[in-house]
Amino acid sequence: MSGRLVHNSVSDDVTLTVTSTAGSYAATNMQNKQPSMKWRSTTDAAQTISGDFGAAEVIGCVVLYNHNISAAGTVAITLASNSGFSTDVYTKTVDALDATAGYGTQKYGHDGYGGYSELGWQQRFTIIWFTPVSRRYFKVVITDTTNSDEYVEVGRMMWGDFTNIPYRYGAELGWREQTEVTRTRGGALRSDARNPYRYTNVESTILTDAQVADALEIFRAAGRRSDVLWSGFPENTDEYLERRYTMLGKLMDYSSSIREAEGSSI
């Protein structure tokens, strides 16, 4: 198995140009590492977000996280070497969300819903993977003209390259509970109802020297300070499997490189 790790969002330091902005929901909120801070448009008309990296950057992934784009919406990205988007153009258009699966579509017990997947439980994020290209100018066009909110909003946007991390079977995925339960003087149980958070724990297989160097650089540059995107099954034909093993979060613990007989693992 091989996952992908994205950590260096080169769009965080550029000036973003957007079609519209509602009140204090500024475009700079998409560059904040707290996805609860959002950019919001004034209407549900097609919205364009564009910028200039300042120099050619290698891009292989675009992330829109914590958005309200509906299943009817689309996201189109464009990269180019000139501001007019006419030279060395790369484009890709995807559906904003995976299709909703009805009864009988998934295997029995899928996600605890007895074979039923409905829009309400889906996390609102869109990940666009592609073969990395080097370009200077970028834009994304969000088209969702029937959005029930009558506006479009995005909490986090990332443009960057990805590092392939092959990993062993036995990878963990679960929820960490932060709620503390105490007993009152009268004997009743009381909880402080804190929100749980999702986590994954991965051990790599044997890595190439280049992969080790990339992973260690991510640990140094991002550490616990920045956000990273992890996808355990990128571009998998089972889109529901890919969504379950994709998360935007922080590296809470990571090990050093261990040199083995065949190579290195982390």
Specify the residue positions occupied by each region the protein language model found.
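Extracellular/virion structural assembly segments
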Residues: M1-T48, D52-E57, C61-T74, A80-I266
